[in-house]
């Protein structure tokens, strides 16, 4: 890990709950997409764990530590526009940058939508209903595209900012 330079300070950004949330989602999504069988109990349990963690994270986004709060990193469309317009000389954010903030919202909405469609598939009314199954699969594939963009963005920003963003999601600290 890069040590803070003479003009940098180390900041505790990602609290324990945020990091547990993040890595729990990584495991649940990875296992459900690549290993478990749709409709089987492990797939359901992992899906409900992921959806439950997203609900808890939404609550934490209002009452949690300062960098966990949506008010700290949820950007207006104008802020996103200015960020993209000045992409080469853009500001470096301690928390999520404007694009990453919107990506977090997108991924959380995907997980909640998967939880809802997965739940519906387990009900008598919608069990085996093709349009719900297709919607569930469609959302899953779109979410995995978002995950790929998220990982690519984190790697790119780690290179651009010269600080390991993935490691910060392990130990919680970023150099500012």
Where are these regions (language model features)?
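Membrane-embedded alpha-helical bundles that constitute the cytochrome b-like, heme-associated redox core
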Residues: 1-176
């Amino acid at each position: 890990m890069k040590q803070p330079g003479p003009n940098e300070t180390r900041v505790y950004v990602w609290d324990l709950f945020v990091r547990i949330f993040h890595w729990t989602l990584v495991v649940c999504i990875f296992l459900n997409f690549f290993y478990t069988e749709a409709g089987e109990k492990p797939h359901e349990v992992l899906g409900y764990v992921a959806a439950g963690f997203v609900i808890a994270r939404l609550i934490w986004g209002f009452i949690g530590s300062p960098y966990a709060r949506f008010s700290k990193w949820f950007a207006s469309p104008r802020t996103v526009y200015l960020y993209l317009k000045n992409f080469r000389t853009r500001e470096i954010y301690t928390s999520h940058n404007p694009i990453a903030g919107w990506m977090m919202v997108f991924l959380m909405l995907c997980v909640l939508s998967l939880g809802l469609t997965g739940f519906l598939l387990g009900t008598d009314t919608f069990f085996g209903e093709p349009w719900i199954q297709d919607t569930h699969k469609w959302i899953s594939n779109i979410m995995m595209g978002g995950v790929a963009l998220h990982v690519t963005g984190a790697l790119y920003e780690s290179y651009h900012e010269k600080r390991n963003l993935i490691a910060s999601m392990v130990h919680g600290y970023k150099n500012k």
